């Protein structure tokens, strides 16, 4: 994508950024880092961003100990695998990594100010497509070049967002997860809805030099999954595949981020924390497992603001 901006060329940095993203994003995951502020994109302006983070979830860490990794490696080398507790543990680990993986995350985004209080955008998270909108219900709606009346340093802004992500989920590229998948033939899809309530205080008029933001987040996820192993047996009977199952769960969290820069370019460190009870999940041969945990999402974002030069 080419961006025009007076006196500067962003082509090389953009290409380098895209290449770095491809290297760092090892698996697809719906982005949950909140790097927005309470102020939406001013009408007629664009914002282009890149965000790099890390999803640190306790559920998959709990399910993936050294013994399980060894069991996965051993099972992957066998022509037939005996059904038992180890197979159930492999399934639980696969589910935990799909529901909330431990992995790097990255996304490229673009936003546009549709009207004074509303903007919308698209994110590509390397396998996950994300569409979102944000409505500002508190604070002025001008720009650093044309600040609204009352826009001074310390002004409070507030908004509410709506983000929808869809993806064909896959396990992260880790050797023991590849072993699990070769045994279980695991498949999954998921959709995610995220609603952040964002409050921020401006640094300079209309966030000219940045802002500090914080707030609460509600998220809801819908997951479909199944297992279709070819060589798992109980005695002499082959274990049948698990038909596609559908589950959904809610997440609750909070976040804080710091936007620092000047007018056109900003750096945004952020951290989000979520708690979720994923619920109960059916496994092969009538078994089941339940999962819950906490997720930490530290991130670092970069944002380029493209003003409306027609004003």
Residue spans for each PLM region:
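Bacterial N-terminal signal peptides that target proteins for export
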Residues: 2-15
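C-terminal motif of bacterial Sec signal peptides marking the signal peptidase cleavage site
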Residues: 24-27
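Transmembrane beta-barrel domains of Gram-negative outer membranes and organellar outer membranes
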Residues: 29-158, 165, 296
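Outer-membrane beta-barrel transmembrane domain signature
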Residues: 51-70, 75-89, 173-311
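Outer-membrane beta-barrel domain signature
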Residues: 93-94, 106-107, 114, 124-126, ...
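Long amphipathic alpha-helical segments with strong coiled-coil/leucine-zipper propensity
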Residues: 159-161, 174
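Short amphipathic beta-strand and strand-loop transition segments with alternating hydrophobic
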Residues: 162-164, 218
């Amino acid at each position: 994508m080419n961006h025009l901006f007076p006196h500067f060329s962003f082509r090389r940095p953009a290409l380098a950024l895209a290449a770095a993203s491809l290297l760092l994003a090892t698996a697809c995951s719906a982005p949950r880092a909140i790097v927005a502020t309470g102020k939406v994109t001013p009408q007629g302006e664009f914002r282009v961003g890149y965000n790099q983070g890390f999803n640190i979830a306790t559920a998959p860490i709990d399910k993936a100990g050294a013994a399980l990794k060894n069991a996965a490696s051993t099972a992957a080398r066998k022509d037939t695998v005996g059904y038992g507790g180890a197979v159930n543990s492999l399934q639980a680990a696969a589910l935990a990594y799909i529901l909330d993986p431990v992995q790097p995350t990255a996304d490229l985004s673009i936003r546009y100010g549709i009207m004074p209080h509303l903007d919308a955008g698209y994110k590509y998270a390397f396998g996950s497509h994300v569409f979102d909108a944000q409505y500002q219900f508190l604070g002025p709606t001008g720009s650093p070049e044309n600040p609204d009346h009352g826009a001074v340093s310390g002004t409070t802004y507030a908004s509410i967002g709506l983000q929808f992500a869809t993806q064909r989920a896959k396990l992260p590229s880790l050797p023991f997860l590849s072993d699990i998948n070769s045994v279980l033939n695991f498949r999954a899809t998921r959709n995610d809805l995220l609603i952040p309530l964002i409050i921020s205080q401006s640094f300079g008029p209309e966030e000219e030099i940045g802002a500090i933001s914080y707030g609460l987040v509600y998220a809801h996820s819908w997951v479909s999954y199944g297992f279709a192993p070819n060589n798992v047996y109980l005695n002499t009977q082959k274990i049948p595949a698990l038909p596609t199952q559908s589950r959904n769960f809610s997440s609750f969290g909070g976040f804080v981020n710091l936007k620092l820069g000047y007018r056109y370019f900003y750096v945004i460190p952020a951290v989000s924390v979520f708690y979720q009870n994923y619920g109960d999940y059916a496994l092969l041969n009538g078994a089941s497992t339940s999962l819950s945990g906490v997720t930490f999402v530290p991130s670092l974002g970069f944002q380029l603001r493209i003003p409306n030069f027609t004003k």
